[in-house]
Amino acid sequence: MVVYEVPQKNRQKVVKYAVISYSIAIRTLGRAGAKYQKLLDSIRNSTVQPEKVVVVLPEGYSKPKEQLGYEVFVHCRKSMVGQRLAALKYIKSEYTLFLDDDISFEPDFILKLAKPLQEKKYDCSTGPLFSFFPASKAGTIAGILTASVSVSLFHRDMYVKILRSGGWSYHTFDTSEERYYPTESFAWTCFFIRTQVMRNLNMEDEIPWLEKNQYAFGDDRVMAYKLVKRGYRACIVSTALYEHNDAKTSTASTEIVNTTPPYCTGFFQIVFWHRFIQDDEPLKFMKVVNSFCIGYWMVSSFAYRLLKAVLTRGYWPIFNAVMRGIKAGIKYIHSDEYLQLPPIRY
């Protein structure tokens, strides 16, 4: 076995690791500036160096001035999902680390992510990002009441569990001790995966509906849950900590920030529920349960958001956007385009 050596801080011990065949794929608009530089510094300082770094930009966007000096730059049609997939054409490594342009991590980060895959226990891994969970008490209560997102009660051995409403439950944990937490969803900002598994997911099949509304809301949930549905396993490595510095280079206007995401929330919930939960359910009784769950989500979401619109100044546009998104989602799942989508399983 080929090994390389990394001295410990005390210089008295030497730890040996197997060489990891991996490449890095970065999705960027080339505008993250200092935050992108932090990512490049993290890559330079990584204990395990990648075989290749592929940087994917949308057509018409310039290369960032911050560079490693050996990366491959690729341009593709502007697409949040498409930019992820474009890098695969240039990668032959066994594993790929997919990154957004505003991530930073410690030198041993790759080693921690690769471990569960090399042990043949999982096919995809990433670190915990608790900042993506509801931060406020009001948000937590609203998520529970509408079956959108809640703290896990029955799946505390997992990081995220997808609910029959199309929502999800989550579990926070101690990050000081290494442990693998199975998960059915994770933030798409950073993940380490077997390259062939990523190809096998056929994520290009999901682009027609994920990017139908300018804003690829829920692409992370779709990718992770499709991975699970196709028989693969994903985990969170509790000690694989990283920083998401959120450059927010994709939110270009007030209209997109305030209106499009709420619309996409309603649209996504309906389509995701129908495609990944209802259509994939073989038991008729559970289909009835699923229908009750999404019905509850729609009624409770309407009631909660209506009350918030009455009590909160300026919330009516968001309320209307969510309701329009739900209506559009219901219409879409009966469209020819949707009915022609390939099945999520093989």
Q: Which residue stretches match the model-derived regions?
A:
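Glycine-rich, basic loop-to-helix element that forms the pyrophosphate-binding segment
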Residues: 75-91
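Short, acidic, metal-binding catalytic loop of nucleotide-sugar glycosyltransferases
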Residues: 38-50
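Acidic donor-binding loop at a coil-to-helix junction in glycosyltransferase catalytic cores
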Residues: 186-188, 209-225
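A recurrent flexible, glycine/aromatic-enriched loop bordering the glycosyltransferase active site
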Residues: 81, 157-193, 215-216, 256, ...
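Active-site donor/metal-binding and catalytic loop motifs
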Residues: 204-217, 230-256
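Non-catalytic, C-terminal membrane-associated alpha-helical segments of glycosyltransferases
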Residues: 263-265, 280-346
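Short aromatic/hydrophobic "clamp" motif used to bind/position activated sugar donors
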Residues: 96
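Conserved donor NDP-sugar-binding/catalytic core segment of glycosyltransferases
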Residues: 108-156
